[in-house]
Amino acid sequence: MYKRFTAICFSIGLLLSYSLAYAGVVTHHFKTLDLTAEAEYQTGNPDKPAVLIMHGFLTTNQFHTIKATVQAFHDAGYTTLAPTLTLNINKRRQSVKCNAIHTHTLEQDQLEISEWIDWLEKKGHKQIILVGHSSGSQELLALLASRKDPFIKLAIFTSLFYLNGEELGTNPAELDYSKKALEAKNNQPHKYSFLFCHNNYYATPESFLSYQKLDRQYILEQLRNLEVPNYTIMGSEDKRYKSVGNNWLDELKQTGTNLVIIEGANHFFSSEYEFDLQDQLVQITNNHFNQP
């Protein structure tokens, strides 16, 4: 009888603790950029790590792959933080179109991500997992190359490719133009081809060039040298293999990352593959931290 009463009290206490959990939008001001960004923050079990989840190129934390990732970790009891990069837009909430004026840089993105990690640490989180989708994975990988943080315990990259390569549509003449423009101190916006933006990516040379370091060789090298335990999750039916070649998966595996391939999934893990992604994310994390 006493044991049953104790169990009931424990269950009530657990329910009360979750009822006091925070879930909502938080803001952070970047002093050096004079910009404020928003993030969705949900507290979970304090004994579990916190997960920072980074969206892909020009999107927000409302993108369906990010929402699914957040939901998976939240349902498993993990604290989650999903920021939206400002891209030089104060409190940005919408995706940015190709033909908008792009003045943001990779360095600014990394500064924002780094300060969000600091934000989590100031909240008392001593175990942090970094999860990225698409270019969000590349940006996290680039950040980890320079940030040696004992509180970052695990990194999971999903749909990890690269941003610069003629096979992706990068035009060498446009790269040459941008370099010469900066040398001449001309930072006026210009139209480029960049990823899914065909001849209509309207960016300053500084902005455009900053992302070009994320080429095939750089991504593979950083992944090979990464000291943080890491996994890379890829969809077997990602259309980007048509551009980069199916040997990309072999090259990823050779870096030493723990490669997981979800059969049938596309770049965004759409439809039923969303659940496969969620299962893999939680399974990887639970196993790594010996969670039940």
Where are these regions (language model features)?
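Cap/lid segment of the alpha/beta-hydrolase catalytic domain
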Residues: 87-104
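Alpha/beta-hydrolase active-site loop
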Residues: 100-123
